[in-house]
């Protein structure tokens, strides 16, 4: 009777509680290198680095890591471009592109500062909203894939940095890829001599005689005879010089 009442009222011995450890989701092996690379580029800009568990804690954290990776890569690309543009010395080499180089530097500096501020706002601010960075992330990705910098500006930057075959120093002018034309030194341009081609002889026709044209004979006046001077010899014609 007591056992029946105990079973009904739950007075019996309780079974031992067993716990099962819940394992965290492990990313696939093919995605781990990309995640490690994303963590590396993002942690390089954060004062307090994040771990892989922090980045994969939830779907929102994973999305935040993807956005931060795009911003970090854009930031590093801007810094590399700024370093290369800094090699241009305004006023000394190619002064006509000083304005374009300064405009590129201002644009790259603003984009780099905005990327850095957005990454810090995403990870360091309390209650940061990810949607505030969506527009900037899309612009950063678009600027890397479809940059609004046209090819003429790229050519200007290459000429300023000396990265292409176009010669800028010394006032040389470029006549094409790999061809540099030196500036004129004030000498008049002498046209090449004209060459007249004789008509080709047909089959059976005789070839023209290659003899030069006859030069006019110029007679030299005979000096006046003198009783004491020796008798001069016969007059000679002036030599015929071709081309006169």
From Swiss-Prot:
PTM statement from Swiss-Prot or TrEMBL: Phosphorylated.
Stated consequence of mutating residue 19 to A: Loss of cytoplasmic viral assembly center maintenance
Family affiliation: Belongs to the herpesviridae UL51 family.
Alphabetical UniProt keywords: Host cytoplasm, Host Golgi apparatus, Lipoprotein, Palmitate, Phosphoprotein, Virion, Virion tegument
Major location (coarse): virion
Name of the featured protein: Tegument protein UL51
Lipid addition sites, S-palmitoyl cysteine: 9
Species this protein is from: Human herpesvirus 1 (strain 17) (HHV-1)
């Amino acid at each position: 009777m007591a056992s029946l009442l105990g079973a009904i009222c739950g007075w019996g011995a309780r079974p031992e509680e067993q716990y099962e450890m819940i394992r965290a989701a492990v990313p696939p092996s093919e995605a781990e290198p990309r995640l490690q690379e994303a963590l590396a580029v993002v942690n390089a800009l954060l004062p307090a680095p994040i771990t892989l568990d922090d980045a994969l804690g939830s779907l929102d954290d994973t999305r935040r890591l993807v956005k931060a990776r795009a911003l970090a890569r854009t930031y590093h690309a801007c810094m590399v471009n700024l370093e290369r543009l800094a090699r241009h010395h305004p006023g000394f080499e190619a002064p006509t592109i000083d304005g374009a180089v300064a405009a590129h530097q201002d644009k790259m500096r603003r984009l780099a500062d905005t990327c850095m501020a957005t990454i810090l706002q995403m990870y360091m601010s309390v209650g940061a909203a990810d949607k505030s960075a969506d527009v900037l992330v899309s612009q950063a990705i678009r600027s890397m894939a479809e940059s609004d910098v046209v090819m003429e500006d790229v050519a200007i930057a290459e000429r300023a940095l000396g990265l292409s075959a176009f010669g800028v120093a010394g006032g040389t002018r470029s006549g094409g890829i790999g061809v540099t034309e030196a500036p004129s030194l004030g000498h008049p341009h002498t046209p090449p001599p004209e060459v007249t081609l004789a008509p080709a002889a047909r089959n059976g026709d005789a070839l023209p005689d290659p003899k030069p044209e006859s030069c006019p004979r110029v007679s030299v006046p005979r000096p006046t005879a003198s009783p004491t001077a020796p008798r001069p010899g016969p007059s000679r014609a002036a030599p015929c010089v071709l081309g006169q």
